[in-house]
């Protein structure tokens, strides 16, 4: 039997601006609101059917650190048995999360998964809080 991965819905948060109305909203809260809303809109899929959550995040530190995917599972009201992981591929993190969930479905490892992405461009400075580039690589053009 061949498994096909199917996207049943897609949603996102509003896009904020620097010092705009979204200032002070934590990225884990924002991502959890999106996942919770996704589950509420799709009542044919129950939270106990979700077998994995893969969260893309280019800078998983500060308020987006500490395995933010687990925080999103808890804050969105998913069962604590739902595993989660964070993928860092910089600008391609959320797309890689989607690829990983679809691959897990197509290989038969899971039947239902959520891929998501989160990035608070204003709470993490460019390069992160403590960039420590390897000296030899930093010298290369």
Predicted regions and their residues:
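Acyl-thioester C-C bond-transforming condensing/cleaving domain
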Residues: 1-5, 17-47, 62-66, 73-141
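Short polar catalytic/cofactor-binding loops
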Residues: 11-15
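Short glycine-rich phosphate-binding loop at a beta-alpha junction
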Residues: 49-56, 114
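A glycine-/small-polar-enriched, mobile loop at the entrance of the PLP active site in fold-type I
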Residues: 55-63
